[in-house]
């Protein structure tokens, strides 16, 4: 015979009543999709009008997901993956196309832009703290025409909020968190929009400080006394301990940064924006543990750290030529990364490799872009990019 179970009755009731509830909630209201304006093709247009694969996250989206870095919002973009081993150490991957992420001199297959400033670099891309960000645009597939040789697999664009004319505004934010397995953490930021000359000049200042508490312990242990790999072992190899390096929560990190943008509206058709920013990342060990040592524990024999400091400067000119819109961007990017990792527990003798201290001084010089859009049908880009990269790699 037929018998109605409590679960079946509950499901049937929910399915029957759901349309009625929906009709009551939406009665008298219009339902539509939110229009997102992007500039991925170097002109302002709706994301729905672009015949390409692009995902955009607005500032409201980023706030809702509490995004602080690349790895926080990458999971919401289907074609994007971020490989990260710690703060300030990330590799952006589109559609699974990637080079050796462990090589510091490997050329990236995906480019990262902060406004009109290219952050693409050999090895790992620098971390961008998500403070005062207008939106994030992710372009999947080759983008070399507009974003250079690094954009073979895709391009990530991080767009900051620009200075606003005739509006004095200050925004502060602070949050703290704690857990049973590690140190406490906090995020603090301040944003100041300052009008200098009515309808002509405005300044926007951003400052932030963040601490991510460590949660991995380096516990006491000895070096292995057997040679599983067949390499030569120094005398007394099995008698060394790590008493001098024992530390709790040793993978913590701190981030300090600032950004300043000065916008000058020359007239209705021409404007310039000068942007300067700096960020310093001081982090401990990698976010990795050894399950043989215990949960969230490792046995290391020397301190581990990563220091990542960079400064950026950008000058952008935008104007109407009558027959086309012109965007000229000149930028400079200086970055120094120092990394110290312990390899004591490895039985093989390591030859010199691209490790230790990594210093890079990449400079990006002007590119120009013009687009004609008279009838809305004919549109052509004229694009020129002239990058110069100088890098010094020191091994130890």
Model-derived features: positions:
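Non-catalytic regulatory/gating segments with a bias toward low-complexity or hydrophobic composition
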Residues: 54, 62, 74, 136-141, ...
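Extracytoplasmic beta-strand/coil segments of soluble accessory domains associated
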Residues: 39, 71, 75-117
């Amino acid at each position: 015979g037929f018998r109605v179970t409590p679960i079946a009755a509950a499901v049937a009731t929910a399915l029957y009543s759901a349309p009625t509830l929906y009709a009551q909630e939406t009665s008298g209201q219009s339902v539509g999709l939110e229009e997102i304006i992007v500039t991925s093709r170097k002109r302002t247009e709706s994301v729905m009008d672009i015949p390409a694969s692009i995902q955009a996250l607005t500032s409201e989206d980023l706030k809702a997901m509490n995004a602080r870095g690349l790895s926080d919002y990458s999971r919401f973009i289907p074609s994007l993956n971020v490989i990260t081993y710690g703060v300030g150490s990330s590799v952006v991957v589109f559609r699974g196309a990637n080079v050796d992420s462990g090589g510091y001199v490997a050329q990236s297959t995906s480019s990262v832009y902060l406004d009109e400033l290219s952050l693409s670099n050999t090895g790992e891309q620098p971390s961008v703290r998500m403070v005062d960000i207008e939106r994030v645009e992710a372009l999947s597939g080759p983008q070399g025409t507009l974003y250079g040789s690094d954009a073979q697999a895709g391009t990530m664009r991080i767009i900051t909020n620009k200075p606003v004319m005739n509006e004095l505004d200050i925004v502060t934010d602070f949050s703290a968190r704690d857990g049973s397995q590690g140190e406490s953490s906090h995020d603090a930021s301040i944003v100041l929009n300052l009008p200098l000359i009515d309808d002509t000049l405005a300044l926007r200042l951003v400052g932030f400080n963040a601490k991510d508490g460590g949660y991995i312990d380096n516990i006491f242990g000895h070096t292995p006394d057997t040679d599983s790999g067949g390499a030569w072992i120094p005398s007394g190899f099995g008698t060394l301990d790590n008493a001098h390096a024992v530390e709790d929560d040793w993978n913590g990190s701190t981030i300090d940064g600032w950004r300043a943008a000065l916008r000058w509206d020359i007239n209705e058709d021409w404007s310039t924006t000068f942007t300067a920013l700096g960020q310093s990342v001081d982090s401990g060990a990698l976010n990795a543990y050894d399950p043989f040592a215990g949960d969230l524990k490792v046995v290391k024999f020397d301190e581990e750290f990563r220091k990542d400091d960079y400064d950026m400067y950008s000058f952008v000119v935008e104007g109407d030529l009558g027959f086309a819109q012109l965007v000229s961007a000149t930028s400079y990017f200086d970055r120094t990364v120092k990394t110290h990792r312990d390899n004591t527990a490895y039985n093989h003798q390591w030859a010199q490799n691209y490790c230790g201290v990594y210093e890079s001084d990449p400079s990006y010089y002007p590119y120009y872009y013009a687009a004609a859009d008279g009838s809305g049908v004919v549109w052509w880009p004229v694009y020129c990019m002239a990058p110069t990269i100088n890098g010094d790699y020191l091994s130890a």
